[in-house]
């Protein structure tokens, strides 16, 4: 029986991080968590990490697709925060970001790690950006690295 499992140490990986400016006081923590995980755990060189800032979470899928289609990156990490408010805006933005990023990954065969927080409150977002609930940016980075290796192993 052949079993394929990915590892996270990927020193030669080329990774793009697409990050939303909206709610940047939370997203900055996600970014720091992602970069720390890429460098410290994944052993990715600083020169192999590209950060692209976009206005909000809604713009992440298009940006991820353009990055994936360049052929310059082994994975894309999407980071952002969508917090529920008093209108239906949350459902539209969160839904489009989620389905759009999944579509990019399926259509390009480049891993797109989902590091977009979708929370009910600012407090929940802060918890998921490095306090009680860990750092979802770091988790997304580790997912991206593991998927790079899984896909390489499948195609080998």
From Swiss-Prot:
Coiled-coil stretches: none
Binding site for 5-amino-6-(D-ribitylamino)uracil: 22, 57-59, 81-83, 114
Keywords of the record: Riboflavin biosynthesis, Transferase
Enzyme class, first EC level, given as a word: transferase
Binding site for (2S)-2-hydroxy-3-oxobutyl phosphate: 86-87, 128
Active site, per annotation: 89
GO molecular function, one term: 6,7-dimethyl-8-ribityllumazine synthase activity
CDD domains on file: Lumazine_synthase-I
SUPFAM superfamilies per record: Lumazine synthase
Gene3D superfamilies: Lumazine/riboflavin synthase (3.40.50.960)
GO biological process: riboflavin biosynthetic process
EC number(s) stated in the UniProt entry for this protein: 2.5.1.78
Pathway(s) served: Cofactor biosynthesis; riboflavin biosynthesis; riboflavin from 2-hydroxy-3-oxobutyl phosphate and 5-amino-6-(D-ribitylamino)uracil: step 1/2
Alphabetical list of InterPro entries matching this protein: LS, LS/RS, LS/RS_sf
GO cellular-component term (any): cytosol
Catalytic activity, as annotated: (2S)-2-hydroxy-3-oxobutyl phosphate + 5-amino-6-(D-ribitylamino)uracil = 6,7-dimethyl-8-(1-D-ribityl)lumazine + phosphate + 2 H2O + H(+)
HAMAP family listed in its UniProt record: Lumazine_synth
Function (record text): Catalyzes the formation of 6,7-dimethyl-8-ribityllumazine by condensation of 5-amino-6-(D-ribitylamino)uracil with 3,4-dihydroxy-2-butanone 4-phosphate. This is the penultimate step in the biosynthesis of riboflavin.
PANTHER family hit by this protein: 6,7-DIMETHYL-8-RIBITYLLUMAZINE SYNTHASE, 6,7-DIMETHYL-8-RIBITYLLUMAZINE SYNTHASE DMRL SYNTHASE LUMAZINE SYNTHASE
Quaternary structure note: Forms an icosahedral capsid composed of 60 subunits, arranged as a dodecamer of pentamers.
NCBIfam families per record: lumazine-synth (TIGR00114), PRK00061.1-4 (NF000812)
Protein name stated in the entry: 6,7-dimethyl-8-ribityllumazine synthase
Species of provenance: Serratia proteamaculans (strain 568)
